Amino acid sequence: MKIELQRYLKKKFPELYPPDFSFECNDGWFRLLLWLSRYLEMYITQQNEMAKSHPQNYLPVKQIVARQVKQKFGTLRFYSDGGNQHTETVIDYTTFISGYICEQTGNTIDVGYNHNGSVEVLHKDLAKNKNDFNFVDDEELRTILKNI
């Protein structure tokens, strides 16, 4: 990920990303990471406020600290300490969604992957082997999305 985008995330979410943290993925997943970071920050803040005012009903949530954010087997991996079962579920869902977004461009149309070699989710124009390219969406949906 470009250094400017990394700096932005670390500046906006200093509790989530330590100063020496480095992202090991491409720019296409920046917005996905931005939205995830916003949600995690909001959720932890709200839960902890509720735990203070209603301790009988809410448990505090330990601050999440990212340990590694990278691409692995074509999806985003977000390894961290802290959080709770809910934040783990949100992170798992983000991993799932990343498999439908081009890691390099952020495109969501005409995205797929190759079976041979390293697995990356890419726009069809960036595919290394066009003969082994597998779209994540079926042809009917790709046609609809291109025409709307």
Model-based region annotation:
Residues 144-148:
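Intrinsically disordered, low-complexity regulatory segments
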Residues 107-113, 131:
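Short functional micro-motifs and their immediate structural scaffolds
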Residues 102-105, 123:
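Short cysteine-rich clusters marking metal-coordination/redox-active sites
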Residues 127-143:
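Short metal-binding segments enriched for Cys and/or His
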Residues 87-101, 135:
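Extended Gly/Ser/Thr-rich low-complexity repeat segments
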Residues 116-130:
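Cysteine-rich micro-motifs
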Residues 97-101, 109, 116-119:
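Short metal-coordination and nucleic-acid-contact micro-motifs, chiefly zinc-binding Cys/His arrays
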Residues 1-88:
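Long, charged N-terminal interaction/targeting segments
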